[in-house]
């Protein structure tokens, strides 16, 4: 199948560090399946500068064709295609005979709608922002609404986004599906590439929980680990909406917990002043983040405004009891007290959740880990890409 993938949320160069690679993972998996995928990155220049995104001149970069526009695609977007790119002129573009166009983020969706080719619209938190923020009411909201009506299908990046979109536009129900991301198999302890695939589920589960010990007294059975105090981890770029301060305040004064914070940003000095006992590591390479997760007991990040949240899946795969925000991000995959915990994004709720985890019985903790293990097996990058593609095939 020939797919044209359109989005500005895509690394132009393979060594680019600042752009999320979640959409890249879908493309890579589809290519492994034998499909041809061309990537078109339409870039609204002003938006690029306002958001501090990397800027590249228009042209072909490895497998990405980057096109810059001063205006947000008001005019004929096709006029900038040139014969030097892999996409070529408009005539050449049509000759590619793309079976489907997959477009993500507001700019990608608006651009795809301009092309006049059948497309799937991928909904992120940014799209919900355009549809609900009064600042976009006059111009962008009507254009995005029109594009969504024209889309053959709508792929929401999380269950939360699906529910938010359908609350706004219930008429889209028959063409909406959820397209979550999945973790790389190497990121999960039980899916390590070196692991013998013949191991049973029980063997895998024992490896998954190998760093956890359970009290044998179920009447007084608290969470006991090889770590004393209990190791709590959070990881994010220090933005206000990540609510790192709420985690620090929740742990402050709780002698049974030790908090480590991975990340950096403008808020760091303020955060460090809240509690001198918190361990700040700064930014770490991805493999070191995973190592920290595997050496922790609880991962908590009560952020808001998340499209999805790969870090939660990675924490679950690393054997952490994982806490996310209720009604945001990965809620719907994480189910409260079943395979993780949901919390309100305030320090009192986070503190209460941590104490609830500490007081889990042996049976409750065992059930939690079993369910978490079973959940994560369904969210690898390969499986998620396959399910996304299956949904696309349904509309063709």
Model-identified regions with their sequence ranges:
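N-terminal subdomain of nucleotide-sugar transferases
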Residues: 1-53
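Carbohydrate-associated surface elements
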Residues: 160, 182
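Aromatic "clamp/platform" in nucleotide-sugar-dependent glycosyltransferases that forms part
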Residues: 304
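Nucleotide-activated donor-binding/catalytic signature segment of Leloir-type glycosyltransferases, i.e.
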Residues: 269-287
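Nucleotide-sugar donor phosphate/pyrophosphate-binding loop at the beta->alpha transition
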Residues: 18, 84-85, 118-120, 128-146, ...
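Conserved donor-binding/catalytic core segment of Leloir-type glycosyltransferases
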Residues: 4, 155, 200-202, 226-242, ...
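Conserved acidic donor-binding segment of nucleotide-sugar-dependent glycosyltransferases
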Residues: 282, 336-337, 341-348, 356-362
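Short hydrophobic beta-strand element within catalytic cores of glycosyltransferases
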Residues: 321-324
């Amino acid at each position: 199948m020939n797919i044209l993938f359109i989005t500005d949320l895509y690394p132009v160069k393979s060594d680019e560090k600042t752009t999320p690679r979640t959409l890249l993972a879908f493309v890579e998996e589809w290519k492994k399946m034998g499909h041809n995928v061309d990537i078109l990155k339409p870039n609204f220049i002003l938006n690029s500068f306002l958001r501090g995104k990397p800027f590249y001149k228009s042209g072909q970069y490895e497998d990405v064709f980057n096109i810059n526009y001063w205006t947000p695609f008001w005019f004929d977007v096709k006029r900038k295609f040139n014969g030097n790119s892999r996409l070529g002129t408009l005539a050449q573009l049509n000759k590619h005979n793309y079976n489907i166009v997959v477009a993500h983020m507001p700019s990608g969706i608006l651009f795809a709608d301009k092309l006049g080719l059948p497309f799937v619209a991928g909904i992120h938190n940014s799209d919900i922002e355009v549809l609900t923020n009064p600042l976009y009411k006059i111009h962008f909201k009507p254009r995005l609404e029109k594009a969504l009506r024209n889309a053959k299908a709508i792929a929401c990046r999380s269950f939360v986004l699906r529910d938010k979109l359908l609350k706004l536009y219930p008429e889209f129900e028959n063409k909406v599906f959820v397209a979550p991301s999945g973790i790389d198999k190497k990121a999960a302890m039980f899916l390590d590439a070196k692991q013998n695939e013949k191991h049973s589920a029980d063997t895998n589960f024992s490896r998954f929980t190998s760093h956890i010990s359970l009290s044998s007294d179920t009447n007084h059975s608290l969470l006991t680990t090889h770590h004393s105090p209990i190791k709590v981890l959070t990881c994010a770029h220090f933005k206000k909406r990540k609510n790192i301060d709420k985690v620090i305040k929740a742990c402050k004064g709780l002698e049974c917990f030790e908090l480590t914070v991975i990340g950096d940003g403008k808020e760091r000095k303020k955060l460090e002043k809240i509690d001198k006992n918190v361990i700040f590591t700064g930014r770490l390479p991805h493999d070191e983040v995973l190592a920290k997760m595997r050496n922790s007991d609880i991962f908590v990040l009560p952020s808001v405004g998340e499209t999805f949240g790969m870090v939660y899946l990675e924490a679950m795969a690393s054997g952490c009891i994982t806490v996310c925000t209720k009604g945001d991000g990965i809620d719907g995959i994480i189910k409260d007290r079943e395979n993780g915990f949901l919390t309100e994004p305030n320090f009192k709720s986070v503190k209460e959740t941590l104490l609830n985890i500490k007081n889990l019985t042996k049976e409750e903790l065992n059930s939690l880990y079993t369910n978490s293990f079973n959940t994560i097996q369904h969210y690898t990058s390969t499986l998620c890409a396959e399910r996304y593609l299956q949904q696309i095939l349904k509309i063709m």
